[in-house]
Amino acid sequence: MTQVVVGQNEPIESALRRFKRQVAKAGIYTDFKKHQFFETPQEKHKRKEATRRRQRSRRR
């Protein structure tokens, strides 16, 4: 879980920027987008296969 402690003289904008950076680094937003809709086993298999193909082509 991402947590940001706001300092006494720290502006809210900088704390919000730090929070957004930590969320992006932890991959929380991408995980949320991935689980937002139900994915059938067939769709999951297609997505994983496409990822494998993409990674294989990058290695060459």
Curated annotation (Swiss-Prot):
**Where does it sit, as one GO cellular component term?**
ribonucleoprotein complex
Query: Can the keyword Ribonucleoprotein be found in this entry's annotation?
Result: yes
Map out region (Disordered) in residue numbers: 36-60
A single Gene Ontology molecular function, please? structural constituent of ribosome
Cysteine-cysteine disulfides: none
Q: Which PROSITE patterns match?
A: RIBOSOMAL_S21
Keywords from the named record: Ribonucleoprotein, Ribosomal protein
Coiled-coil segments on the chain, per record: none
Q: Does the keyword Ribosomal protein apply?
A: yes
Query: Pfam families, alphabetically?
Result: Ribosomal_S21 (PF01165)
Q: Where is the composition biased (Basic residues)?
A: 44-60
InterPro entries membership: Ribosomal_bS21, Ribosomal_bS21_CS, Ribosomal_bS21_sf
Concerning its family, UniProt says: Belongs to the bacterial ribosomal protein bS21 family.
Stored HAMAP family: Ribosomal_bS21
Report the protein name in the record: Small ribosomal subunit protein bS21
Please name the source species.
Synechocystis sp. (strain ATCC 27184 / PCC 6803 / Kazusa)
Lineage of origin? Bacteria, Bacillati, Cyanobacteriota, Cyanophyceae, Synechococcales
Gene name, per UniProt, is: rpsU
